[in-house]
C-alpha cells in the first residue's frame, strides 16, 4: 500500500463543508449525552479497585445495557463472550493499555473517559456516514439528508447507544 492510497483512506474521515453545520450540532449533542453518563458515574467508577467487574455490574443502572466495556478496559479479561464477539475483547486491548498508563499517571480509573472517546468517535462518524449515504448514494437533497439523519439519531435506542458503555455503537 503506497502513501497515496493511505491518504485517500484517511480522506474518508474529512468532514465536508456541507456536513459541517450538522456535524457541529450533532457533535455537541453526543458530547452532552456522554457528559451525562460521565457526571452520573464519575464518583463511582473512577476510584481504583481490585474487582472492577462487581463494581460496574452492581452500580451501573441504565436498563437494557451493561457496562462490560468499562470492566474490560479497566481489567482486560475475557469479559465479553468471545464466541458471540470474537474481536471485541481484542479491540479493547489498546484502550486497556491506555487506561493502565492513565491510571499510573493520574491515580484514577479513566475507563469512562476512554470508552466515551471511542463512542464519541463512532457515533460522530456513523452520523457522517449515514448523511453521506442519504446524500450521495440514495441521492436525496441536503435538507432531506439532514432530516433523515437527525430523525434516525432522535430514536431513543440510538441515542442511548451513543452514550452507554455497551458495544452497540462501537
Where are the regions that the model predicts?
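Membrane-interfacial, low-structure loops and terminal tails that flank and connect transmembrane helices
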Residues: 1-18
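Transmembrane signal-anchor helices characteristic of membrane glycosylation enzymes that use polyprenol
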Residues: 14-76
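Membrane-water interface at transmembrane helix exits
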Residues: 38-42, 96, 100, 131-139
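Short hydrophobic/aromatic helix or loop-helix immediately within or flanking a transmembrane segment
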Residues: 77-109
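Loop-to-helix entry region of an early transmembrane alpha helix in multi-pass inner-membrane enzymes
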Residues: 102-128
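Transmembrane-helix signature of polytopic, membrane-embedded enzymes
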Residues: 130-154
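Specific aromatic-rich, kink-prone transmembrane helix
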Residues: 158, 170
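Short acidic/glycine- and proline-prone juxtamembrane loop motifs at membrane-interface regions
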Residues: 163-169
Amino acid at each position: 500500500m503506497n502513501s497515496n492510497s493511505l491518504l485517500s483512506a484517511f480522506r474518508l474521515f474529512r468532514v465536508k463543508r456541507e456536513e459541517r453545520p450538522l456535524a457541529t450540532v450533532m457533535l455537541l449533542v453526543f458530547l452532552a449525552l456522554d457528559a451525562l453518563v460521565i457526571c452520573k458515574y464519575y464518583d463511582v467508577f473512577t476510584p481504583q479497585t481490585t474487582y472492577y467487574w462487581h463494581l460496574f455490574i452492581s452500580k451501573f443502572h441504565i436498563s437494557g445495557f451493561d457496562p462490560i466495556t468499562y470492566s474490560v478496559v479497566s481489567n482486560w479479561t475475557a469479559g465479553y463472550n468471545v464466541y458471540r464477539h470474537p474481536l471485541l475483547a481484542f479491540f479493547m486491548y489498546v484502550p486497556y493499555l491506555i487506561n493502565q498508563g492513565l491510571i499510573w499517571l493520574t491515580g484514577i480509573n479513566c475507563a469512562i473517559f476512554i470508552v466515551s472517546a471511542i463512542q464519541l468517535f463512532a457515533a460522530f462518524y456513523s452520523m457522517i456516514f449515514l448523511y453521506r449515504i442519504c446524500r450521495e448514494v440514495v441521492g436525496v437533497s441536503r435538507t432531506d439528508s439532514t432530516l433523515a439523519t437527525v430523525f434516525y439519531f432522535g430514536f431513543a435506542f440510538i441515542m442511548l447507544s451513543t452514550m452507554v458503555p455497551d458495544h452497540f455503537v462501537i
